[in-house]
Amino acid sequence: MAKFTKTHEWAELGSAVTMGISKYAADELGDIVYISLPEVGQAVVAGEPMCEVESVKAVSEINAPVTGTVVEVNTDLEDSPELINEDAMSAWICKIEATDIPADLMTEAEYDAMDK
């Protein structure tokens, strides 16, 4: 079951944490035309920017939902960033080997109830 951040990233917790941006974030951005994926081996810190997504409206930073090391990236997004608009919850950005998982990640119900 996915957990969510206040900055609209989702994280599927497991042996590696799979992450992406929420449907709300994708809808707010509009048509996504480019994503700068993080690099495998890149250290990331929960709540800190790890990559960027560019839409027809804006360029936005994507924050890491957990602290750890990127172990895999979804290279399909390099050629088809619009996959995020089509199904944000399936179009994962990367997988992170987590060393710290913040306690303030929200359930889907908590995220849906949050003022956006």
Each language-model region and where it sits:
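ATP/adenylate-binding site constellation spanning eukaryotic-like Ser/Thr protein kinases
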Residues: 64-67, 89
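Short, surface-exposed secondary-structure boundary micro-motifs
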Residues: 49, 55-56, 75
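Short, Lys/Arg- and Gly-enriched loop/turn segments at beta-strand edges
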Residues: 54-63, 80-83
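Generic hydrophobic/packing signal
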Residues: 66, 74, 97-100
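Acidic, low-complexity mobile loops and tails
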Residues: 1-52, 82, 86-116
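Charged, alpha-helix-enriched surfaces in structured cytosolic catalytic cores
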Residues: 65, 79, 106
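Short, conserved beta-turn/loop elements at beta-strand boundaries and strand-helix junctions
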Residues: 13-16, 59, 73-80
